[in-house]
Amino acid sequence: MSIQIFNTLTREKEPFKPLKDGEVKMYVCGPTVYNYIHIGNARPIIVFDTVRRYFTYRGYDVKFVSNFTDVDDKLIRAANELKLTVPEVADRFIGAYFDDVDQLNVAKASVNPRVTENMDEIIQLISTLIEKGYAYESAGDVYFRTKKFKDYGKLSGQELSELQHGARVEYNERKQDELDFTLWKAAKPDEIFWESPFGNGRPGWHIECSALAKKYLGDTIDIHAGGQDLVFPHHEDEIAQSEAATGKTFANYWMHNAFLNIDGEKMSKSLGNFITLHDVLKDNDPNVIRFFMLSVHYRKPITLNDAILEDAKNGLERLMIAYQNIDHRIQTDDGEYVEEAHEDEWLEQLTELKQAFEDDMDDDFNTANAITTFHELAKRANIYLAKETVSINVLREFLSMMRLFAEVLGLKLENTQTDSLDDSEVEALIEERLQARNERNFARADEIRDILKEKNIILEDTAQGTRFRRG
C-alpha cells in the first residue's frame, strides 16, 4: 500500500501524494537555542528523522529543513545571565545540540537555517502582509490581523468566536484587536535589533518559520511537523501568515507527536522533573534512548522512567545479540555450510517479514509495530542459528534484513562501546580458556571469563564453539 499519514489538518489518515513525484519537502520546527534541549524535545527530533529515513528508503529525495531560533526573549535573558552576547549563547547551544543529537544517530538536515541569518526574508514577508492589508504597524511593532484571515483556527479546530470568548486578554493599546499577534517587536533599550522599514527591532516567533519554509522549500510544502504543543498558536499562526501572503496552501500534511511524560506526569520546571537530553545521555546509551522513543507510536504519549528504559535496553539487546550471532557465524565460515533443504522456505519467510515491516511503516510510520516485526525477525534468526545445517545464503539474507530494518529506524546493531581488548586479543584469551578447560584447570578458565566480563565482553558457549559479544 502507499504511505498513509495522519493529517492533523483533516484529522484523518490520508495517502501521501507528493507535490512532485519522487520528492518530499519537509519542514520541522527546531529548538530555541538558549539552553540544552530537554528530553521531550528529543522525541520529535527522533520521530521525524525516522520519517525522513523511511521516505528515503522508499526512494524519495527528501529536502529536510529544521530551523534554529537564535534570537528571542529567552536568548536575551540567557545572554544577560551568562554575561555573553546573544550570538555567543546561540553558538554555544547550537554546538551542544549537534553534539547531543549526533549521539542519537540523527541525520543532518538538508539545511538548518538560523533566524538571524535570514532577516531580509523575514522583513520582506512582513512587508508583503502589510501591503496586502493583513498586518499593520503600531508604535514600532507590527501585528497580524487575525480576524481578516477567514480560515484561522482550521488546524487546531477552533472558531474565532471561541478564541475571542476564551482569550486571556492582556490589554495592549498597540493592538487593534486582542487576537492579533506580533510579527515584529520594536527594539528595547540595550537589546539586540535589526533595521527594518517598520523601525529597529526583531521578529516575532511565528513569522520566522513561515519565512524560512518559504525560502528553502517554496510557497507550498509537503509536510510540516513538530510537537503537539505547537499546533496552537505557533502552527496556526504560520498557516495564517503564509497563506495570507502567498494565497496558496502552506502545507499539505501536518504531523504532530504526542508529549513525553516523566513517571506519568508532563515534564515541567514547576514539578521539578525537567530533564535535559544532555543529562540523560550522560547515564544512558543513546541507542537505547532512540529505541525507547520509537517503541510507542508517535501520536501516543510516552512515559520515561528507569523501568521502561531498562525494558528498552533489554529489547534492543535482543536484536543486537541476534545480529551479532549471525554476523559471527558468517565471519567464521569454515566451508562446512551446506545447501539447506528448506532454504527457499526460509527465504520466503524473510520476504514476508520485510513486507510486514513496510506495512507497519506505511501505516502512519508505526514504529512500535515495526519494532515488533523486527523482534520476530530476530526470533526466527535465533531458531535458524540453532539448526545443525544452515545455508550461507539464508544467513546473509537475515543479516541484510536486520541491517535494513536498523537503518530505517536509525538503530545501531554493532556494539559501539569501547574496551581495551581488540578481537585478536579476545580470541587468544578464548583459546587459552578452552585449553584450560581441556586440562581441567577450571579455576583458570573461570578467571579468564571474569577478565573478559570486566572488559564488557560476554562469552557464549554453543555447539559451534565459543562466541563472544561486547555487551
Curated annotation (Swiss-Prot):
Gene3D superfamilies: Cysteine-tRNA ligase, C-terminal anti-codon recognition domain, HUPs. One of its GO terms (molecular function) is ATP binding. Keywords: Aminoacyl-tRNA synthetase, ATP-binding, Cytoplasm, Ligase, Metal-binding, Nucleotide-binding, Protein biosynthesis, Zinc. GO terms for biological process: cysteinyl-tRNA aminoacylation. A motif ('HIGH' region) lies at residues 31-41. It is an enzyme of class 6 (ligase). Its cofactor is Zn(2+). Pfam families: DALR_2 (PF09190), tRNA-synt_1e (PF01406). It is found in: Cytoplasm. The keyword DNA damage does not apply. The keyword Zinc applies. Signal peptide: none annotated. SUPFAM superfamilies: Anticodon-binding domain of a subclass of class I aminoacyl-tRNA synthetases, Nucleotidylyl transferase. Its EC number is 6.1.1.16. Belongs to the class-I aminoacyl-tRNA synthetase family. Monomer. This is Cysteine--tRNA ligase. It comes from Listeria welshimeri serovar 6b (strain ATCC 35897 / DSM 20650 / CCUG 15529 / CIP 8149 / NCTC 11857 / SLCC 5334 / V8).
